[in-house]
Structures are given as structure tokens and as C-alpha cells.
């Protein structure tokens, strides 16, 4: 009887240990994703400061889609380049800021970032602001934006 109880306790301890290890791996993955997101966000708007679309395009996965308000979904690197040109040339974006409010997920393959954004013109004036959800994807090149959805806080 004591033998069965002892074996049961050992098996339970092993199972709980495995569960804790999985959670630790997931927490490590999430922390790595958060760090990569912060690094990517820190250089995202350099593309507008330098008028360099390659910086912008490199933030996105090859199969990414940008889902801007009141527009059709734009997918792929060519679409990202077109979006950059429109933001720079038509809207006059020259800088901006992301404020991440939360990152959700396990950090294994996908995580979701929630936050706020601000857009500035050549004079450094705020001309638009809003909120966003970005689904990030872990790729061989690192964490990249996979789905980028945002909307303005301004009235249409």
C-alpha cells in the first residue's frame, strides 16, 4: 500500500514538473517576443524619418497583410511598399510613435500586440492617432508583423 502511494506521489510530482517546464518555456518565448516587438517598434518610424521603405517593409513577414480602416486588405511586400509611399507622400507622415499596452500569447508561433499609435508630420505636429492590434509571427528572420490592423481616433 505504501509502495503504491509513493509511486503515485512520484508520478504526480513528475507531471507537475513537466507542466511547470512548459509554462517556463512559454513565458521565455513570450518575453523574447516582447523584446523583439519593442526593438522592431523602435525602428519602425525611422523609415519615415529617412524616407526608406526598406526599413518599413522589413518589419513585416513576407505573407503579411495591412488592414487599414476604410480600405481593402493589402498583402505582401509590394503592398507594404505601396502603403509606405501613400503614408509618406499623400499623408505627409514623417515620424510616429507606438505605445504597446499589452502583448498576448504563448510566444511559440504567434503573439498579439495591442496598443496606441501617433503620427507626426514634417513639422513634428501630431496629425493622427489611434489604436492597433498586430498579430506577430515567428519567422526564420525573427518576429515579424503578420496582420496589422489599426484605426484612427479622429472623426471621418
Regions found by a protein language model. Name each.
Residues 32-36, 53-109:
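A solvent-exposed, acidic/Ser-Thr-rich amphipathic alpha-helical stretch
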Residues 70, 115-117, 149:
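A mature extracytoplasmic/lumenal domain signature
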Residues 84, 98-103, 115-119, 131-137:
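Hydrophobic/aromatic beta-strand elements that line small-molecule binding cavities or substrate pockets
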Residues 129-154:
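Short beta-strand edge/turn micro-motifs at domain boundaries
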Amino acid at each position: 500500500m505504501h509502495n503504491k502511494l509513493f509511486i503515485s506521489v512520484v508520478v504526480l510530482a513528475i507531471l507537475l514538473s513537466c507542466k511547470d517546464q512548459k509554462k517556463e518555456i512559454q513565458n521565455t518565448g513570450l518575453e523574447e517576443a516582447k523584446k523583439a516587438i519593442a526593438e522592431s517598434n523602435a525602428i519602425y518610424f525611422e523609415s519615415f524619418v529617412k524616407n526608406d521603405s526598406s526599413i518599413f517593409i522589413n518589419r513585416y513577414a513576407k505573407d503579411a497583410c495591412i488592414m487599414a480602416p476604410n480600405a481593402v486588405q493589402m498583402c505582401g511586400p509590394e503592398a507594404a511598399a505601396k502603403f509606405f509611399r501613400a503614408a509618406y507622400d499623400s499623408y505627409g507622415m514623417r515620424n510616429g510613435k507606438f505605445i504597446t499596452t499589452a502583448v498576448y500569447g504563448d510566444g511559440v508561433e504567434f503573439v498579439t500586440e495591442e496598443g496606441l499609435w501617433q503620427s507626426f508630420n514634417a513639422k513634428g505636429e501630431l496629425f493622427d492617432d489611434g489604436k492597433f492590434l498586430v498579430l506577430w509571427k515567428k519567422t526564420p528572420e525573427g518576429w515579424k508583423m503578420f496582420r496589422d490592423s489599426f484605426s484612427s481616433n479622429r472623426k471621418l
